[in-house]
């Protein structure tokens, strides 16, 4: 069967192809809408809560589409910034008006936070604040509350009214029941809010969700004392900074691993708390999840510290499925924390074309965030794997790291500590002193600092500044300093606390050379 079209003939296949292309083109230009299925909770008592959320999503979805389409129709929305912002505001206002006048004009407290959910949420939060995660939870709440917003304390907003109350911190959101992407948790004082993410209005609230007086500490579980030693040089504590620790080649199950783990706990409790730890590979030498991971780091795990792993040459691929390593079944992955994008690579396969292609896209929307990669094998090193670094890893990965404007790379593999001078704009650290037998250090021309000693690292990112420390099991400082993401950041004046830190840093490590800035 053929169809006449102008001066020629098109067969059915061509018609179908053109129709399909037209449909795909329309779909590609459609505004984004999140999935409409509410995530499942493992707690059966929360089924009524899930049902209430699903009803809300189903009720609002048609108006959500209308709001998104209205935003698409804002003139010049993709051009000047003001027009793009107008499109966002249009989407927000159309849906907010529909919620207030058509969809939920008589909504009241408890419509979504049904009684069984209210009971479960209050119970879980009380238990969490009374447990070993107390310090991280109170730190996170204090940080979010200290935003200068008038709504960060006091009574919750009325339902269907706009609210810019701070979001619940991720460490607390993990305790709460899962909710669809159309909604988000926020808080005002002790009240927990459900806020529509598109409309930015409160759709329900739960009074007295947060414990009234969180316990000051957890009696009976202080860290085992490490003599009378305290951390050598606590980092400054600016508002909004993110802090994390790093360990490499740690999974020995031997005494040095336990000593490094104990030093990390001492630092965590006595100096500065870090919510997560990057593991730089060789996490489990003998595939002993209990002896080489759970036992040494249990005090940190119990306090809510997350570990995020990269695979080393002694690790089995099955580790990607081990939930405490937070790899999400992937041997390369990314995540954002504060002003940084973290990218874990599998350097066991440095030339893997799929990984290389993914790396070229993962920073596409990173903007002004720090770009931080972590993986096992270093590109530059001065231990017994120096030739492998030079001849295998560097040729495979350096061009991609430079091309994607990576700021810092953390690696292990060499059982020592090194800070490498910037190479083509990229700063490299080797931190493989987490517990395995040490390697000899042979200085190279690219080394700024190097020493063969067990250690862990702590890093703090504050805007465009990054402070770092390398610390031994005896709480001695191996290295410390400051790096800057941009030349402009380097030219800005440093605050008094940072200047004090750097002065102490210089006096504490007389053998070390000063850290140069990127």
Residue positions per predicted region:
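A short C-terminal boundary segment appended to hydrolase-like catalytic domains
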Residues: 218-228, 454-518
């Amino acid at each position: 069967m053929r169809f006449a079209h102008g001066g020629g003939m098109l067969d059915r296949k061509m018609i179908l192809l053109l129709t399909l292309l037209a449909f795909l083109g329309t779909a590609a230009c459609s505004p984004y809408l999140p999935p409409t299925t509410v995530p499942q909770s493992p707690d059966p008592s929360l089924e009524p809560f899930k049902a209430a959320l699903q009803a809300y999503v189903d009720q609002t979805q048609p108006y959500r589409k209308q709001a998104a389409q209205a935003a698409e129709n804002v003139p010049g929305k993709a051009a000047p910034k003001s027009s793009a912002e107008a499109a966002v505001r249009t989407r927000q206002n159309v849906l907010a008006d529909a919620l207030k006048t058509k969809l939920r004009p008589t909504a009241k407290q408890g419509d979504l936070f049904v009684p069984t959910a209210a009971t479960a949420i209050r119970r879980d939060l009380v238990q969490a604040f009374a447990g070993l995660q107390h310090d991280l939870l109170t730190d996170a709440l204090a940080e979010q509350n200290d935003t200068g917003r008038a709504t960060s304390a006091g009574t919750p907003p009325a339902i269907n009214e706009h609210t810019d109350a701070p979001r619940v911190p991720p460490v607390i959101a993990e305790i709460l029941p899962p909710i669809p992407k159309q909604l988000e948790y926020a808080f005002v004082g002790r009240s927990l809010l459900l806020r529509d993410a598109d409309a930015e209005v409160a759709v329900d609230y739960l009074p007295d969700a947060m414990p009234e007086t969180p316990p000051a500490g957890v009696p009976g579980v202080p860290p085992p004392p490490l003599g009378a030693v305290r951390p050598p040089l606590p980092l400054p504590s600016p508002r909004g900074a993110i802090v994390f620790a790093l360990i490499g080649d740690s999974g020995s199950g031997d005494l040095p691993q336990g000593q490094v783990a104990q030093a990390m706990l001492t630092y965590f409790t006595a100096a500065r708390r870090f919510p997560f730890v990057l593991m730089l590979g060789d996490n489990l030498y003998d595939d002993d999840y209990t002896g080489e991971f759970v036992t040494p780091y249990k005090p940190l795990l119990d306090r809510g510290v997350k570990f995020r792993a990269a695979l080393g040459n002694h690790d089995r691929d099955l580790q990607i499925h081990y939930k405490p390593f937070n790899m999400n079944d992937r041997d390369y992955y990314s995540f954002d924390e504060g002003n940084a994008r973290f990218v874990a690579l599998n350097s066991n396969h440095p030339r893997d074309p799929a990984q290389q292609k993914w790396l070229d896209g993962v920073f596409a929307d990173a903007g002004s965030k720090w770009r931080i990669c972590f993986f096992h094998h270093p590109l530059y090193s001065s231990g017994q794997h120096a030739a492998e670094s030079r001849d295998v890893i560097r040729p495979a990965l350096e061009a991609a790291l430079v091309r994607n404007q990576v700021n810092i790379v953390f690696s292990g593999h060499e059982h020592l500590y090194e800070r490498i001078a910037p190479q083509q704009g990229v700063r490299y650290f080797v931190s493989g002193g987490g517990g395995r037998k040490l390697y000899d250090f042979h200085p190279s021309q690219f080394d700024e600092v190097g020493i063969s000693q067990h250690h862990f690292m702590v890093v703090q990112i504050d805007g465009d500044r990054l402070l770092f420390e390398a610390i031994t099991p005896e709480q001695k400082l191996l290295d410390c300093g400051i790096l800057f993401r941009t030349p402009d950041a380097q030219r800005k004046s440093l605050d008094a606390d940072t200047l004090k830190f750097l002065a102490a840093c210089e006096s504490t490590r007389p053998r070390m050379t000063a850290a140069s800035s990127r």
